């Protein structure tokens, strides 16, 4: 493709791109009958540039942490999701406030810039402050937004936050993002949005992800039933957006597997912002009733703790022994259900987790004489109760006995988990799942491309068990947690 384009006059024009795509689809259909796969491969090739044959190829990131007992003391990693949710709530009602201690990573900056594109007034300072300066509300029936192009970066949560904010106002806009969002599956969103008086269509025929066009009437219902296939991040963004609706709304979460996990995070945030919200949770019903309003925040808004990153650091002693201490309050995660899930998981494993005032600490294998082997944690045979964001961590921890014994029982996983992804993760550790049993195989030497930051963090823990695992996209972690690899490479202290 690259060679053809360089030989063509006016190289790169849309006509030539169309000719290439049409030719590709005609010829590729001879080897595959899956039109979706053919289009996805072509979209991937769009990202590839011709390179000289002698050009040095980038090497994968070698994961080889020190396998010694840990003695780590650090501040707890700050959350980037809670500040983004607060930025959106403040923008929804044009609330003036200052967020303190915010990690200025890629997703936070992309969210800030995206909100500014639709009328918010946000600016950031190098010390981690984000100043929400009022301006015009970005939600509401009287705030139409027409013929606008909005860039949302590379994070799906930012995309969903923006989508559901724009659904609250008459809108006709184009949403674009980085390459990672070209392949996000927006089909569940497209099927759901008509219930909210909106429509999302793909700009590229047959491509599921961005770029996409959103049209919204802002004619919002008073009752919404959430479908089971709606992504968990999209559900969270929807609940956040209800604060800016024009009428009271009841969101029925009964049919969604992650409903309780998500509402346990969002409800306290809405209530702390002065939004009237009440939960109905019975055996047959799970629903959230929200009375829209303008968010009001206290003066000192701290970012809270990133529960997945904190749990990853606290899990390290289970692999090599020692202790990890993080300064911070566990309640500051703003996610009580995930916090309880971490406590329950560590308790099953036999990892000592202490949540004292102002400090989180985890230890394992203390008291073992020098030279004695570290025992394996207790086996965990069921991971179905874990929130989806914690599943990769739970899997890595549960595999410790099987890796050391070169086999064992595969823990039970949620039905929705990507089984191909799980199998490729197992292969990196020299395991394969056959009829519910873990069997030993030759470890894969192919560099692993992680689909999410959570899976990349889990792989970094797996390297304690099998050093020199190769991660082809370490930037997926750096984008969210810029200092993680520095910490990782300086262990055991």
Q: Which residue ranges define each predicted feature?
A:
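Short, structured segments at the rim of ligand-binding sites
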Residues: 1-493
